[in-house]
Amino acid sequence: MNTSSRIQLPSSNDAHVYDGRSNEPKASKRSYVNLTRQMRPKDALKMNISSPNLKDLSKFADPDAQQWLEGYLAGKLEDNSKTPRSNFVDPLYEELNARRKPNKPVWSLSGPLPHVLGNSVVEKLEARSRASSVSNSRLNSRTNSSVSLKGMDGSSSWKNKIKNAVSNVTDQSKR
């Protein structure tokens, strides 16, 4: 009989493996796992991975909230005067929106997010762009810029002050 062969006794759940060379039982893999579970502290960090429930993101228990969301997504919000208005939607989003053009792919988080602006914000942006297209816009922007203003102490020779400061630093470093 070979003395180095291992014999497993199927007597209990925590089975031990006997080695022919020694009389001491060796712990099986199952008992080793149980031992490591006992040694681990109860508040040990555990990993758990779950995927988000994307189906229920746009569902509300409140029917009014659900109706408001559907109106918002359709661009039919009502203000205090109860007149429907449409939201401004970024043209890039319109181009990538799959509901309007079925042959286009749906935009994803890897692409640009939609920019939905209120009508008042759109009017302000258009007013700014109209004001900047005036023929004197370059002159207006230069007169209002901080570069063309006088120095902090009221003198207009800020360029000379910077040149003098740079030359003083270089002169001191040569010494």
From Swiss-Prot:
Residue ranges with Polar residues bias: 1-14, 154-175
Low complexity bias spans: 130-149
Cell compartment(s), UniProt: Cytoplasm; Nucleus
Region annotated Disordered, chain positions: 1-31, 127-175
Protein keywords: Cytoplasm, Nucleus
Predominant place of localization: cytoplasm
GO CC terms in record: cytosol; nucleus
Biased composition, class Basic and acidic residues, residue ranges: 16-27
Protein name: Uncharacterized protein C186.04c
Annotated source species: Schizosaccharomyces pombe (strain 972 / ATCC 24843) (Fission yeast)
